[in-house]
Amino acid sequence: MTQEQLLKNLQVPSGIVDVILDTDAYNETDDQYAIAYMLLSPERINVLGLCAAPFHNANSSSPEDGMVRSYDEILHLLDLMDRNELATKVYRGARGYLPDENTPIETDASKFIVAEAKKHSPEHPLYVVAIGAITNVASAILMDRETMVNNTVIVWLGGHAKDYPHTREFNMYQDIAAARIVFGCGVPFVQLPCRGVVSHLTTTGPELTYWIKGTSKLADYLYEHTVWEADKYAKGKVWNRCIWDVSAVAWLLNDNDRFMSSYPIPALIPQYDNTYSVDPRRHPMCYVYEIKRDAIFGDLFAKLRNMK
C-alpha cells in the first residue's frame, strides 16, 4: 500500500462500507448498544459478520467462558432485533489471549476475518471494528499479514489517551501482545482511547427512560441491562454509565467530524509496563482526541426509537 493510500484509509469513509464487528458482547452493557447502532445504520454499514472476543472479569469464569457468553449474547441481540438471518455470520473467537507476538490463535473468527479481507483491496478495504481485547484481529494479522495490512482498516476502542498516566485499560491489558501487533504492523489503524477521550460518552437512567424506554423490545433490554449493571455498584445513588463501544461504530458515520475529531500521529507503541512509547519514525495512525457526546447519543437514540 502506498503512503498516500494509507493516509486516505485513515480518513472516515464515504458511502456504504463492509464491516466485521469483533466484540466481547457479554462483558458489560456497551457492546449491546454498539451492535444495535451498527445494525441500525444500513445507510453506511454493510455488516458481513460478528466475531466473539475473549474476556475475563466478574461476568465470566475465564477468557474462554467470556468468549462463549459473548457469542451467545450476540445471538440474543440478533433475535431481539429480528435479524436472525445474521446468525450464520456469527463466529467464535479465541479461547484465550495470545501466548506471544508471533503465534496466532486460529479460530473460526480469525479465519473469517482473513477470508473476507482477501475479497477486498486497499482502494475498497474491509473495516474491522474491534471493541474488546483485540486477540482475534491480531491473530488474523499473524495468519496473513500482507492481506490484512493492505486490505483492511482496523478501528479499535482500546487503551487510554496518549497523555494519560498509564495504559492499563481493560481491552488493552488483557492482551498487550495483540495490541502491540496491531499498533506495529502498519495496517491503517484508528484508535479511540478510553480514559481521557471516550470516557465523555456517558448516559444516565433518567436519560434512557426519557429517550428509549418503552419504544421496543431491544430498547427495553438495553435500558434494563444498563440499570441492572449500574445497580450492582450504585443502587440508590447518583450514577452515570459510559457507553464506550458505540464510539467505534460512530467513527464510520463521522461525516464532517459531526461525532468526533481526530488527527494522524506516528503509531504509538504499547508497552508491557502499561505505558506508551513514541517513535516519530513510525507509520501513521488515526488518533481520536475528542468525542461529541450529545451528537452521538442523539443519533443512537433516534435510530433506536425509529427501529422497525
What positions do the PLM features span?
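N-terminal acidic, glycine/proline-rich low-complexity segments
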Residues: M1-K308
